[in-house]
UniProtKB/Swiss-Prot annotation:
NCBIfam families, sorted: PRK13857.1
Range of residues in the leader sequence: 1-19
TM regions (residue ranges): 65-85, 94-114
Function field: VirB proteins are suggested to act at the bacterial surface and there play an important role in directing T-DNA transfer to plant cells.
Membrane topology recorded in Swiss-Prot or TrEMBL: Multi-pass membrane protein
Quaternary structure annotation from Swiss-Prot or TrEMBL: Interacts with host plant RTNLB1 protein.
GO cellular component: cell outer membrane
Originating organism: Rhizobium radiobacter
Protein name, entry field: Protein virB2
Record's keyword terms, sorted: Cell outer membrane, Crown gall tumor, Membrane, Plasmid, Signal, Transmembrane, Transmembrane helix
Length: 121
């Protein structure tokens, strides 16, 4: 119990502002370097304008093409491989199989279902 009282007295001697100054002084060199680097290496932003250039439908089509293309097929293959490895090591679970198969069905079936419901080509 005496040990706790000694630490409590030690903590009472440090005020909050004193503790903050210790933290700030220990971090000052790295903060100063980071600020100097960000000021010296700043330049104009290379962003597109928000008002024009790309139609939202085009952006959605680009995302669908990306997901349904080779990237999505690779994800589907990796999911099936994960199911096979889990079955090989005896960690099979119906939840894992249902989640992966359901995700594949949703990923590849959503485009077809959307086109069917909207009458798109």
């Amino acid at each position: 119990m005496r040990c706790f009282e000694r630490y409590r007295l030690h903590l009472n001697r440090l005020s909050l502002s004193n503790a903050m100054m210790r933290v700030i002084s220990s971090c000052a060199p790295s903060l100063g370097g980071a600020m100097a680097w960000s000021i010296s290496s700043c330049g104009p932003a290379a962003a597109q304008s928000a008002g024009g250039g790309t139609d939202p439908a085009t952006m959605v089509n680009n995302i669908c093409t990306f997901i349904l293309g080779p990237f999505g097929q690779s994800l589907a293959v990796l999911g099936i491989v994960a199911i096979g490895i889990s079955w090989m090591f005896g960690r099979r679970s119906l939840g894992l199989v249902a989640g992966v198969v359901g995700g594949i069905v949703i990923m590849f079936g959503a485009s077809f279902l959307g086109q069917t419901l909207t009458g798109g080509s």
